[in-house]
Amino acid sequence: MSVTHDVVIVGAGPAGATAAQVLAQKGVTVLLLDKAEFPRDKLCAGLLTWKAVDVLERVYGDTAEGLLASGVFDSASPGYRIRFRERTIASGEMFYPFHFTMRRVFDKHLLDRAVRAGAQARLGEAVTFVDPATGVVRLAGGEAFRAKHIIGADGVASVVRRACPFDAAAWKHGMGGAMEFYLPYDDPRLSGAVHEDLRAPYPTVYAGFLRAGYGWVFPHKEKLAIGIGGHSLLHGREFRSKFRDFLEFLGLPRELADASRGHGLPYGNYLAKPWHDRVLLAGDAAGLVETLFGEGIYYALRSGELAGEAVADALTRGVDPAVPYGKGLRRDILPELVWSRKLRRVLYASQSWGFLPLFCFVRGGGRLLGEMVHGVRSYRLLLRRAKGPQESGCAVR
């Protein structure tokens, strides 16, 4: 016999935990399921922009200062550098710092907050069956639950999404991929003649190594996140060899690429209508990842918040949750994904012409591009979309 809940959320990462937090605060009975025990490691560069911190403050009451003090954020930097291979396109300081986190710590913090708000969590057992029509969700061990509403927040390989009639071929066509590893600062391989960026206290991104993608070096408190990511269809099996080239450029052993981990990444295959019957999809499960730089944490947090609010409306006012959810996505998320994909096509196509097109674009955009990345301005023609932090502007040199 199945146990009935108002809402079952599959996936306890940022999207699922945020939806659970919103619903539990409203007194809704929420069951949060995840195949992993928490804390667990998650492959992610772990960079948060201002817009992500804004959601954390609104939903959880967390501030950047408080998260840094508690160790949930491990470092912050207003600085940045953008390179086309060795040549610097731009460097400077943003009006607001980038914050860095380890997903093992960050996701556990959000889950703990949702449970403290009243959500029930069942961890360590995979969901193997979902019926969007009846709201039945079954675990690998055979235990079943029935829900009035299901939120699928179970990542890029979502079991919930695959139970719905979405176009699997289109999803696969738009997939990206990433390879990444962490290198502790005390690793002896950093003591030799390595690239200066490996000792920089700010994040650096690199064009020119992939036709449709980029590389990165992000500084955390105790280690560096080093990786590449891009469109799988264009690069496929080249990823590892391109990663070796990138590591050689940084002065690191090429064989580090062979020990690195890879994962799929939504890269333009977002679902414009991520719902079916009793199901709403959020975060990576719906492909809601920014399609230029691959930023995913903000879109997971915001779509989780929107999904939670939409289901709460459905339970209290009897509305179809797809209506408020779709409205929120069309207002806050989908335009950013559409226009970042347009920008990606232009910028990646221009890489074949070398350094100059990217240099002119970044230098011409200046302060406005910094506001776009942090979410104060939209990818849609750089229109203003939020008030942002008190100070505005960024220095570019």
Task: List the model feature ranges, each with a label.
Residues 2-15:
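Beta1/beta-strand and adjacent pyrophosphate-binding region of the FAD-binding site
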Residues 13-14, 38, 298:
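Residue-level detector of alpha-helix initiation sites
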Residues 24-44:
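Glycine-rich FAD pyrophosphate-binding loop
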Residues 46, 97-100, 214, 286-298:
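Glycine-rich phosphate/pyrophosphate-binding beta-alpha loops
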Residues 52-54, 58-109:
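A conserved beta-strand/loop capping segment in the N-terminal third of enzymes
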Residues 113-254, 271, 287:
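Predominantly flavin-linked oxidoreductase catalytic cores and closely associated redox partners
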Residues 129, 144, 234-310, 315, ...:
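FAD/FMN-dependent oxidoreductases across multiple families
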Residues 309-397:
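C-terminal helical "tail/cap" subdomain of flavin- and related membrane-associated enzymes
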